Every structure is written in C-alpha cells, then in structure tokens.
C-alpha cells in the first residue's frame, strides 16, 4: 500500500500538484494510518526531515539557537523575518483537502457496495430457508418410512423367534422321545429275569462307555423307583390293577450299579497306587453319580496310610509321650504335640492338592478328611495323654497329682486349637472344625471346674503336710541341737510365710489362666473364676488365721508361765530367788512371743495385700462383665479375711496384756520405797530417773520396736493408744503404793518426763494429754501445803486424781492437809 500511494502521489512540493488517487485496495490487509500519513507528506517535507535528523544528533538548534551565544537575538533575527517559517504548509493543506475528498468518494463507493451485498445476502438467505423447509419435510417422511420398516422388521423377528422356539421345542421333544425310547429299551432289558445281567446291551459292559452307562443306569433306577412308589400309592388308595411292575428292574439295576461302583472303585484304587490323577479324576467324576460320590470320598479317605497304618499311631505316641515307661512332662508333651500336629497339617496339605485335582467337589472330601483326622488320629493321641483322674482317689502329688492332668489338658487343648486353625487355613469345606475340636474336650471341660478346685485343695494340703513334717522333724531333733535352738527353728517354721502365700497366689493365677482358656462365655468364665478365687480366699484365710492362732498360743503359754511363778508374801529367800529367776525366764518368753506375734501380724498384712493386689490386677476384670459377680467376690473376700482380723485383734489384746504384765513385774521388783521417800530429804536430790523407770522404758522401747514395724495406719494408732492408756492406769495404780516427800516428788517428775518423752513416739494425742496431766498432778508432792488450794484452780477435772495423790504426801497427816482442803474441796471430806 505504501508503494502504491507513492506512485500516484506528486513528487513536487508545489501547491498546484496533481491530486492523489486513493484506491480501496490500499485499506485492505494490515492497514496503518501512520504509514498512510507518512507516505502523503514525505515527498513535501524532505528538508524538514533532514533538519529533524540533525537536531536529533545534538549539533544544532531549531530556528538558529546558536545565535543566542552573544546575546544579540534581535540583531540576528532581523534578516530572517523576510522568509516564511514553514513554506510547505500550503502544499500540505492542498494535499490534505484532496485526500479528504478522495476518502469521501471512497466511502460512498464502499457504502454502495455494502448495500448491494446486503440485498444479495437477503436473496440468498430466503432461498436457503426455503430449501431447509423442503429438506425438513423430506426428513420427516424418511423417519416415517424408517418407523414403518422397523415395525415390519420387529414383526418378522417375533414371528421368526416363535418359529425358532417351536423348532427348538420340537427338536427337544424329538431328542427326549429318542432318549425315552432308548431308556425304555434298556429298562426292558433290566426288567427281564431277576439277577440276569448277561443279556444287557453292549453299552453296559463297554469299559470305554462307563460314564454313559452309569448315567443311564441312574436314570433308569430313579424312574423305576418312582414308578413303584406310584403303584404303591395307588394300591393304598384301593384303585390299583394287579399286574407286574418294575421290581425286577429295580433289583437288577441295584445289582448293576453296585457292580459298576465296585468296578470303578477298584479302578480308582489302582490309579491311586500309580498316582494316575487323570484316571482317578475320571473315576471320581463317574462315581459322583452314585450317592453324590459319597462312597468314593469315604473310600479315598479311609484308605489313607495315616488311618490304616498301625505304625503311624505308634509313631505318634512315641513322638508325644517319649519312650515307654517315662513320665511325660507338660513341656515335653507340648513340643511333641506341636511336632505331631505340624506333620498332620503337612500331610493334609499334600492330600488337599491331590483331592483338588481328582474330585469334582473337593470341599466335601476335605471335610471328610479333616473330620477323620480329628476323630481318629487326634482323638487317639488325646486318649493316651489325658487319662481323667478320679476325684475320690486322686493321684498323689509325688506323681504329679491333679495338677499334672490339668496342665496336660491345657497343653493339649491349646495345641489342638492351633491345629484346628491350621486345618481351617488348608481347607475343610463346610465342616465346623472349631466346634468339632471343642467336642473332643467336652467330657473334660464338663468336669474341669471340680478338678481345678480339687487340685488347689490337694496342693494346699500337700504344702501343709510338708510344713508339719518339717516342724515335727525339727522337734524330734531338738534334743540333739539343743531345746532352745530347736524350739526357735520350730517356731520359725510355724510362722506365717509370705512366700507360701505368694505360692498360693501363683497356683491360683495358673488356674485362672486355664479357666480363661476353657471358658469362652463371659458368664461361665465369671462363675468359674469366682469359684477358683474363693479357693484362694479359703486357703489364705485358714493359713494366716492358723498362723495367728499359733502365735497367740505362744502368748498364752507365756502368760501361763508368768502365773505359775506368782508367789505369796511369806516365802523364803531361796524360794523367792528361784521364783525371780523363773519370772525372768517367763518375761523373756513373753517378749519373744510378743515379737513373734508382731511378725505374724506384719506377714498377715503383707499376705492380705498380695491377695488384694492379685484380685485388682487379675480377677476383677474377669468378673465385671457379669452383674453382681464383682461385688459378690468382694464380699466373700471381706468375710474370709474377717476371721484373720478377729484372731489378730485378740492377739494384739494379749500383746498388750503381756507388756503390761512385764511392766507391772518390773515396777514391783525394781521400785524401792526409798525412791520417792529418801531419808536424806533436803540434801541435793538425785536428778536421775529411778531404776524401775529406766528398766520399764528400756523394755518398752525394745519390745515395741517390732510393733512400730509390724503395724501401720489405723491399726497402729489404735494399738498404741490402748497401750498408752493401760500404761497410764498402771502407773497411777503403782504410785499409789508409795509415800512421797518433796525430793521424792522431784524424782517422780523425772520419771514422768521419761515416760512422757517415750509415749510421744506413739503419736496418740489422747495419751500425751493424760501423761501431761500426770505431770501436773505430780506437783502436789513438791509445793508447800499452803499452795495446794491454788494448784488446780485451772484444772478442776483432775482434782479427783489429785486428791488421791495428796493423800500420799509424807506430811499429809502432820500438816493436817485433809482439814485445810476440806473447806475448799468438799470431796476431801
């Protein structure tokens, strides 16, 4: 377009140049107004373009800017004013006018062309619409033709289908009629003479057509039996016509089927010996027509070597039980059963491969095989290892007792369950192998709870007999090792042993493990667990109660020994010395029995804690699923342990009696009348406690050390509180036997300080309060008679005890204290 505009445009810059000629073609394609404008004015402005280029290079200024350097702009611009500044403007104006005129003309030409094209398009659109309408009418007619054709085709197809059905039905009827004719012919052959199978068609004696013969024989047999059944029903109704039936045919067919089945089984056995799986499969397929192949399946399973070889059973017994005559252990039996059942599983897996390749219904054969394995081979070995013992005369513990049977039962049950899972994985058809496995142990599981309880009882009795035997042996040998040492050993053997209780719990825990194994239902499990745990409660209750009673017997013997050496007042010095020596021995026996009982109490508490912890960790979770079971067991546990608590309470009372008796003996033997009424009153008094006080505190510290260790919690607090109260009463009674002067009163205060310091270790506030009051009361021996009325002004509650103590003052009569105090304390009168 640029070249065309240049060709038509004038080359001169004159205003009267030839007008431009613009063409419509110049505006087609990639039109650019800048290019059009440039081509119009480039020929008229060559000098302007050159100046513009020079200005772009930066070497001059437009309109003579260089003249400004001297500052004489007016002088320099005067010569330039005679020429026009832009001379090409007239030419450009003329050019633009001509271009505008031609553009208007071109627009008119374009508008004319557009109007013409619109008319042509409208005409063509009308023709096109008319054509489309005609085509739509033609298409509608075509669719109607297709619909009529489709209906015709459908009608013809239905007719053809009916004809085909008729032809197929006719062919089937023809085939059935042909087969019926053949069957009737064969049936007549079998309905000949009874037992005569020699005149049969060649089909029934051709070994290559055995399958066909078997199929036909089964059909004939079914038909004949149905016909006989219909005749029997008609005869029973009274409208039968006497005539010959198909009894002969049925009998002959039965004989033939039996003979054919035996022949096929013989061929099957021969092929089995050769491992000819294809022949075996062919025979099995044919035999499946006889009683669904049950005879073939059972025959195959029955002929397996593991069921007919006696050596296999002997090998099983040797593998599980070991050499003949040896006592099998549960661990050895477990290993033997694992090895045996692995061998059985491998054998069944190999047989499964053969069965799958041979029989048309392998799952049914596998069910028969697995059932035979469990009922014959597994049951055979279980009968050898699980001889149910009698509860009336159980085997002795030395030979394993009932526990050996229970352990064997658990091992056998676990291993058989594992075998059942393995056989299920190999495949056993529709056989409920788990239920069958359970049935193998049903007789054992029915009586299991009784055997478990009897076993626990047997173990406990054996342990007690062992303990009694050891104690008896020590008693018999005490003459050799010394009576005191022998008695000490015997006493230690009779003490409660936490180790024994732990062993009882271990027996029970093992029994609970077996109970969980054998009891699948939560209710049954809870009932059995409760019964077994009750056995433990009975055992622990009896054991610790008897242990506490034995410890109480020692306390009673020590008490009897003390009573034996209580003497009167008028005895000789020699007798008194002997009695004192015997009393020391009785005191030593009492102290020893006290410590022994505290050890028994401590071990009793530890034993109870072990049982309670065992119940919380192992028993309670098994009882919670059943309503009321947990609460009932908790109540039984409380009842069972209450007997031991009662024995412990009685023993602790005896311990207090023992301690008080020895304290009384020490006070009586060691306390001198001069301790509290020294003849040298007024001289510097002795600030040491009396010898009796020292002996009593030393004894109490020594003997109660075991009580502090053995008792805890509320039991300890109650025991020490009772002991402190008894000690306070005993001291009051003891001091009322003496007369006190002021120095004796100070000695008494020193004794009281010792007692108060000791009883503070009891941690019993009520006891501390009583001994503090004793310290206040003891002041009556120290103060002057005139100060007595004001001594108890703030403590009226102790005036009664103070009254008794005031009467013990040495100057009670001489100072006429009774008269002085009667007016203040009326109770003194």
Curated annotation (Swiss-Prot):
It is found in: Cytoplasm, Cytosol; Secreted, Extracellular exosome. GO terms for cellular component: cytosol; exocyst; extracellular exosome; membrane; plasma membrane; plasmodesma. The keyword Ribosomal protein does not apply. One of its GO terms (biological process) is acceptance of pollen. Transmembrane segments: none annotated. Disruption phenotype: No visible phenotype, due to the redundancy with SEC10a. Residues 244-266 form a coiled coil. Keywords: Coiled coil, Cytoplasm, Exocytosis, Secreted, Transport. Expressed in seedlings, roots, leaves and flowers. Belongs to the SEC10 family. The exocyst complex is composed of SEC3, SEC5, SEC6, SEC8, SEC10, EXO70A1 and EXO84B. Interacts with EXO84B. Binds to EXO70E2. This is Exocyst complex component SEC10b.
């Amino acid at each position: 377009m640029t070249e065309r505009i240049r060709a038509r445009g004038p080359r001169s810059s004159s205003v009267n140049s030839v007008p431009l000629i613009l063409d419509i073609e110049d505006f087609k394609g990639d039109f650019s107004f800048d290019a059009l404008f440039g081509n119009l004015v480039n020929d008229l402005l060559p000098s302007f373009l050159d100046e513009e280029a020079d200005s772009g290079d930066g070497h001059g200024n437009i309109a003579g800017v260089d003249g400004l350097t001297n500052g004489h702009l007016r002088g320099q611009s005067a010569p330039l004013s005679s020429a026009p500044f832009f001379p090409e403007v007239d030419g450009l104006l003329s050019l633009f006018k001509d271009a505008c005129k031609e553009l208007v003309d071109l627009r008119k030409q374009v508008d004319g062309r557009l109007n013409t094209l619109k008319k042509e398009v409208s005409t063509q659109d009308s023709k096109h619409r008319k054509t489309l309408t005609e085509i739509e009418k033609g298409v509608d007619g075509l669719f109607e033709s297709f619909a009529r054709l489709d209906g015709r085709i459908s009608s013809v197809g239905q007719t053809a289908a009916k004809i085909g059905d008729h032809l197929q039905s006719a062919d089937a009827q023809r085939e059935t009629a042909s087969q019926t004719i053949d069957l009737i012919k064969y049936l007549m052959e079998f309905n000949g003479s009874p037992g005569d199978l020699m005149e049969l068609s060649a089909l029934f004696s051709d070994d290559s057509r055995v399958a066909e013969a078997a199929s036909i024989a089964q059909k004939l047999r079914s038909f004949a039996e149905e016909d006989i059944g219909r005749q029997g029903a008609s005869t029973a109704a009274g409208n039968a016509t006497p005539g010959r039936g198909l009894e002969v045919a049925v009998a002959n067919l039965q004989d033939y089927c039996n003979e054919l089945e035996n022949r096929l089984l013989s061929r099957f056995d021969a092929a089995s010996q050769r491992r000819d799986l294809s022949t075996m499969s062919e025979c099995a397929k044919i035999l499946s027509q006889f009683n669904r192949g049950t005879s073939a399946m059972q025959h195959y399973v029955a002929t397996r070597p593991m069921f007919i070889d006696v050596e296999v059973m002997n090998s099983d017994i040797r593998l599980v039980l070991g050499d003949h005559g040896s006592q099998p252990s549960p661990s050895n039996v477990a290993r033997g059963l694992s090895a045996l059942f692995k061998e059985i599983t491998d054998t069944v897996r190999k047989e499964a491969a053969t069965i799958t390749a041979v029989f048309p219904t392998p799952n049914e054969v596998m069910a028969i095989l697995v059932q035979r394995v469990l009922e014959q081979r597994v049951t055979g070995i279980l009968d050898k290892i699980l001889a149910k013992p009698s509860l009336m005369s159980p085997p002795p513990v030395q030979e394993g007792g009932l526990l050996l049977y229970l352990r064997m039962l658990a091992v056998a049950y676990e291993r058989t369950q594992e075998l059942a899972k393995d056989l299920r994985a190999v495949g056993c058809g529709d056989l409920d192998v788990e239920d069958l496995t359970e049935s193998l142990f049903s007789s054992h599981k029915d009586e299991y709870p009784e055997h478990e309880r009897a076993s626990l009882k047997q173990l406990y009795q054996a342990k007690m007999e062992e303990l009694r035997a050891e104690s008896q042996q020590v008693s018999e040998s005490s003459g050799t090792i010394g009576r005191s040492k022998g008695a000490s050993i015997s006493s230690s053997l009779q003490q409660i042993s936490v180790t024994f209780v732990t062993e009882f719990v271990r027996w029970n825990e093992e029994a609970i493990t077996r109970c969980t194994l054998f009891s699948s239902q939560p209710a049954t499990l809870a009932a059995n667990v409760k019964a077994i745990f009750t056995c433990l409660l009975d055992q622990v209750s009896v054991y610790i109660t008897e242990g506490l009673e034995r410890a109480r017997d020692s306390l009673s013997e020590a008490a009897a020994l003390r009573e034996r050496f209580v003497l009167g007042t008028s005895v000789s010095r020699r007798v008194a010395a002997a009695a004192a020596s015997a009393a020391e021995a009785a005191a030593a026996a009492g102290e020893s029995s006290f410590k022994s009982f505290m050890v028994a109490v401590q071990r009793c508490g530890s034993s109870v804690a072990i049982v309670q912890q065992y119940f919380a960790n192992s028993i309670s979770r098994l009882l919670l699923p059943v309503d009321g079971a947990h609460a009932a067991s908790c109540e039984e546990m409380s009842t069972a342990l209450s007997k031991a608590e009662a024995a412990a309470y009685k023993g602790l009372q005896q311990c207090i009696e023992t301690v008080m008796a020895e304290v009384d003996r020490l006070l009586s033997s060691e306390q001198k009348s001069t301790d509290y009424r020294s003849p040298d009153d007024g001289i510097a008094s002795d600030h040491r406690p009396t010898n009796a006080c020292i002996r009593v505190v030393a004894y109490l510290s020594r003997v109660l050390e075991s009580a502090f260790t053995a008792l805890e919690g509320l039991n300890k607090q109650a025991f020490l509180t009772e002991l402190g109260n008894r000690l306070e009463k005993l001291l009051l009674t003891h001091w009322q036997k003496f007369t006190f002067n002021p120095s004796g009163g100070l000695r008494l205060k020193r004794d009281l300080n010792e007692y108060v310091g000791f009883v503070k270790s009891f941690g019993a506030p009520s006891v501390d309060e009583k001994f503090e009051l004793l310290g206040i009361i003891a002041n009556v021996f120290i103060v002057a008679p005139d100060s007595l009325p004001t001594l108890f002004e703030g403590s009226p509650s102790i005036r009664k005890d103070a009254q008794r103590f005031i009467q013990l003052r040495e100057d009670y009569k001489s100072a006429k204290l009774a008269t002085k105090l009667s007016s203040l304390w009326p109770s003194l009168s």
